[in-house]
Amino acid sequence: MAVSIRLSRGGAKRRPFYRIVIANSRSPRDGSFIEKIGSYNPQLPKDNENRVIVDLDRARHWLSVGAQPTDRVARFLDAAGLLERKARNNPNKAVPGEKAKERAEERAQKAADAAEAAKAAAEAPAAEEQAPAEEAASNSEEA
């Protein structure tokens, strides 16, 4: 029989309350369990001492006989210093997707076009200013 340390939901609709239980992994989430070793109330603030309550002696016993904690319970046990969670490595998580890359390229192209247009607009008045000065110089030579 595979035994797991997991959460069993209780409480009213939209007001969850969880018991941390030892249960057969094949039994339903809120079904029968072997032993209750704690509770978790997500409604309480994160710094509240009653948010997560775990009987560490019983948890240590069940871990020693091979019970497997779920991810959330493993997080609680790690915070209590009873279990060392493995660090997960997902280097591709932060890599942008194809559409995001396309949008970034389009933005870069628009920025380059805008910079080029601004540069051309800045050069055009400068060229026009030089032209009247040349005309004035040629007009003064004629006079």
UniProtKB/Swiss-Prot annotation:
What organism is this sequence from? Zymomonas mobilis subsp. mobilis (strain ATCC 31821 / ZM4 / CP4)
Protein name, as recorded: Small ribosomal subunit protein bS16
Q: Where is the composition biased (Low complexity)?
A: 111-143
Q: Which Pfam families match?
A: Ribosomal_S16
PROSITE patterns the record matches: RIBOSOMAL_S16
- What Gene Ontology terms describe what this protein does at the molecular function level? structural constituent of ribosome
Example GO BP: translation
Concerning its family, UniProt says: Belongs to the bacterial ribosomal protein bS16 family.
Q: Basic and acidic residues bias: where?
A: 96-110
Q: Which domain of life is it from?
A: Bacteria
Q: Which GO terms describe its cellular component?
A: cytoplasm; small ribosomal subunit
Region annotation Disordered: where it falls in the sequence: 85-143
Task: Tell me which InterPro entries the record gives.
Answer: Ribosomal_bS16, Ribosomal_bS16_CS, Ribosomal_bS16_dom_sf
Q: Which UniProt keywords apply?
A: Ribonucleoprotein, Ribosomal protein
